């Protein structure tokens, strides 16, 4: 993912009912470090308030399921969106002191990693969502084909047991 010039990087450790956000300027200065509820209006307010500082990049640790709302709100607010994969997150966490795993620490690591090592980020774009939907539909087709084959083979087996001369 290419990030270009980003003025504010928001690391968002997503959760089921609440998230923790850590926003940093390009200089590394933390300008926001608070929990956020899973609420569209409050997410939008934070994103738009931080846009006063310039271009905003929102980086999440989980782009699907519980991370879908912050991503949708960030896109709608005009923010860039990125994703820090789990393996990159774990490796980045090893670079920071301490071993405790807290939402605040994770949000800080996400933001700082996105700011200092943008090559670790993955794009969260709509094409990936379409591709995921197509993979799911393709999986359904595979399941249906396997079920049809299984049914035909079972029917053939039962008919052969009843009337063996059908095998010829």
Residue ranges, per PLM feature:
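Phosphate- and other anionic-substrate recognition elements at nucleic-acid/protein interfaces
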Residues: 1-168
């Amino acid at each position: 993912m290419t990030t270009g010039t980003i003025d504010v990087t928001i690391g968002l450790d997503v959760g089921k009912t609440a998230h923790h956000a850590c926003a940093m300027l390009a200089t590394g200065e933390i300008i926001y470090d608070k929990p956020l509820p899973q609420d569209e209006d409050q997410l939008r307010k934070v994103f738009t308030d931080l846009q006063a500082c310039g271009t905003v990049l929102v980086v999440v640790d989980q782009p699907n399921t519980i991370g879908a709302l912050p991503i949708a709100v960030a896109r709608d607010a005009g923010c860039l969106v990125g994703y820090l994969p789990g393996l990159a997150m774990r490796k980045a966490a090893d670079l920071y002191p301490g071993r405790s795993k807290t939402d605040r620490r994770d949000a800080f690591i996400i933001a700082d990693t996105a700011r200092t090592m943008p090559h670790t980020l993955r794009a969260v774009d709509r094409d990936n969502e379409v591709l995921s939907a197509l993979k799911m539909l393709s999986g359904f087709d595979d399941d249906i084909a396997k079920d049809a084959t299984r049914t035909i083979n079972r029917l053939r087996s039962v008919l052969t047991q009843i009337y063996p001369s059908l095998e010829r």
